[in-house]
Amino acid sequence: MTLLATHAPATTPGLRIERLGPALGAVIHGIDLTSIDEIAAFDIRRALLAHKVLFFRDQHGFDDDAQVRLGNLLGDLTPGHPVAGNHERREIYNIDSSDPEFSFSDVWHTDVTFMKRPPAISILRAVTLPPYGGDTSWADSQAAYDSLSAPFKALADQLLAVHDGNREWGAFLKKNGGHEWEGEIVTELPAVEHPVVRVHPETGRRGLFVNPGFTSHVSGVSEAESRAVLDALYAHLTQPEHTIRHRWAPGDVGIWDNRATSHYANRDYTNTRVMHRVTVRGDEPRGVDGLRAQ
């Protein structure tokens, strides 16, 4: 896919961006996601690079077909999930709290970083909502990196970290088997390395690319050093100044840049909560000066 920076600006009539914070989060008005064209999709991607998390309200006609269509306009869709999968549409990950094997997302994480090429973009649609609770928060990994001290940036820039999906999905995979991902059926989840600081492939900005959900340790250092570095980065990443919180309403759709954010879904409800997610294919994370897993 051609980088957005090489495109001339485009404008969708009626589109209005309502910022939610200095750098993170925006509500997009004036777009019906059920009938967008390539120009509107370009504008969404451009807004996503600037604001990292976008919300669209009152999209009541936005169904599974429309969600898949939107995803394909934004890039190439992945299958719904490399391990979990209980929806008739292969592109959709059905997140249903009534499923006895449902995995709660009440830990800060970035989607599917335990694979070599995590998704670039995630699109989440509210299907069934509890009367209260179930909010989602996002953290801005680029703002978090920018606000680190220079010595800590220099340290983080040269580190690799291991991401391991077995802690969350290993037992599920062993019991149920995996699904297609990157053209192959997933039968095991070997740990992968990613740079601790990721350089965004479209903007060139640096951001922290570790998360408590899937990052197990920093490579090449002692366990104590790894724990100290990760704990410090997690605490810094999730400071209130780097986060926003969204209370879902019927008809809401959220889109986020999975290369520049982490998120957390509150586990504070007892009624059923169902969300449908699709993800746009990403690339292999690269760090500062091209740092990558060996």
Task: Go through each PLM region and give its residues.
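Non-heme Fe(II) oxygenase catalytic core, chiefly the N-lobe of the double-stranded beta-helix
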Residues: 2-253, 258-294
